[in-house]
């Protein structure tokens, strides 16, 4: 890997002369060491040179180039390997000018265990070879629906192995015809294995084979005069027919297909992923790039070259995440990322002397015998003409599928921006991967449905955003605040939760960019106070939250002042006209909401006064009569009169939303802590007593009561327990 040393003045020519004509990955850094962009290249020297030798770069790329202070490159053996490395680096480094999809939690699977009598179960996580996995499914609901179908048709067990091994009579599921009760040998191992095999074929989309086998089995029982068994198989066929009839509109000839639709609307982009597993359409999931309002035009859905606001967009990684209340999307410079994606000079533009013999007309898949509805996409030199949709789709495919299972068919609304991505997917999957851009028949219907769902999701998101922005504006107007950019309004809300003084926890939730930022939520374990003292708990959490922030800000201000004095000594013209006030620094909120009345607000005022913070940002939310929503009163710490808002107030709706989220976050944490405490033995809390010593104590005294009743001498007689440790244990238990 090449790592040129960073200097005060970046010299591109010196760096470019050292670059090889080999495939690899390049990274641009700014003066602070932050990664600006990660890209791949067939020829590193030509690709990187294109940024510094071209005279007609777009304004956005030119702006990025001016920030480059260092270039690093990594040579790979092939372009496919470079694509994999590029994808990994984008995920790890989250560069400002790359489109980044935030890793969502793993998709759910339906698992058939490797037990003698396999159990079917809902599963998330890494897969192994001991069990069978079917999926992934787009949602937990899709998995559970499939489990219910398999219970109704094949009657496979769902109980834990520990329950299965200890049952002496069938459970309720057997009585209602949802399990064949292998736990009590109500079915033979051979027959149960046949049901498992049929269930596997059903999940793989081979329903016809299952029906044929069941029909043959029914006739065989009838010919042997085993009419009860024949009737049972007939009922099984009837259940399966009912299921297939109910899902006739969803079932196609394909086994596994993913449908990817990209839609730009109202300044936002949505990627809608629909999944077909075993021929059944299992639903879809929408992903949205955050903060692209200024990057796309409302009318055209494309980038607006004249929008100068892009240069000042907020910094941070671009995050495509499912929009939820309290989502974890970080502030992002998506405008820059999307602009760079569109305006980036084509990789092969400098390679006019290479690949002159390439011919168009190859289908975008591996192998021969492509489906008749396969897109006639051709290997492209440079970027696709699909605009930003193709760029976003390529980013999604790379970050969603590389390293994960790839279905044999991808139906897409736009062609990926580069051919190499498809080649890498094929190499990784080990089977043919067909990318269809103009599907026919059922696949076409699926794509149209995915595009429609993407538009609906975008319309819903835009409507919710408009409502949320209106609430933010109403709150600032109500509080008499002047805020030039409402997206930068940051609200933090605190709540205290405990059960009769037990497991006291404080929560802090954050509202920023017109939505809850759950990745910035924090819980604080409150200790060293009288149980149930909410005032002391509030003092502790506010002090812990803001004390370090203020101290760090003071240190930063001192460093800046020293630098200014040094510069002023060298050049008196640089001396500041007047000393500026020391800011609190960090990520201070604009408003701090306190869930409580005058008492809690007074405690907060005292803490803020001690820390030198503005008490004007403190707002208490006191519950009204009967604790009914809509009767809350806002209490201020700076002497303003309490303010009662009407039930229909948009400002009150926002305050209630944030307050309720703080309460939810606090109470869930408190319950988890309380449950953990109650399930933990007192011996686990003893200092100096690990697992082995704890086991010896329990073996000697028979349990916790015996340990508590033991004297110091009895404790010291246990192997590994010294006299000093025995005295310490005795003191902690009494």
Curated annotation (Swiss-Prot):
This is UvrABC system protein C. Belongs to the UvrC family. One of its GO terms (cellular component) is excinuclease repair complex. Disulfide bonds: none annotated. The UvrABC repair system catalyzes the recognition and processing of DNA lesions. UvrC both incises the 5' and 3' sides of the lesion. The N-terminal half is responsible for the 3' incision and the C-terminal half is responsible for the 5' incision. It comes from the Bacteria. Residues 346-365 have a biased composition (Acidic residues). Keywords: Cytoplasm, DNA damage, DNA excision, DNA repair, Excision nuclease, SOS response. The gene is uvrC. Signal peptide: none annotated. It is found in: Cytoplasm. CDD domains: GIY-YIG_UvrC_Cho. GO terms for biological process: nucleotide-excision repair; SOS response. InterPro entries: GIY-YIG_endonuc (IPR000305), GIY-YIG_endonuc_sf (IPR035901), GIY-YIG_UvrC_Cho (IPR047296), Hlx-hairpin-Hlx_DNA-bd_motif (IPR003583), RuvA_2-like (IPR010994), UVR_dom (IPR001943), UVR_dom_sf (IPR036876), UvrABC_protein_C (IPR050066). Residues 345-386 are annotated as: Disordered. Interacts with UvrB in an incision complex. GO terms for molecular function: DNA binding; excinuclease ABC activity. Residues 208-243 form the UVR domain.
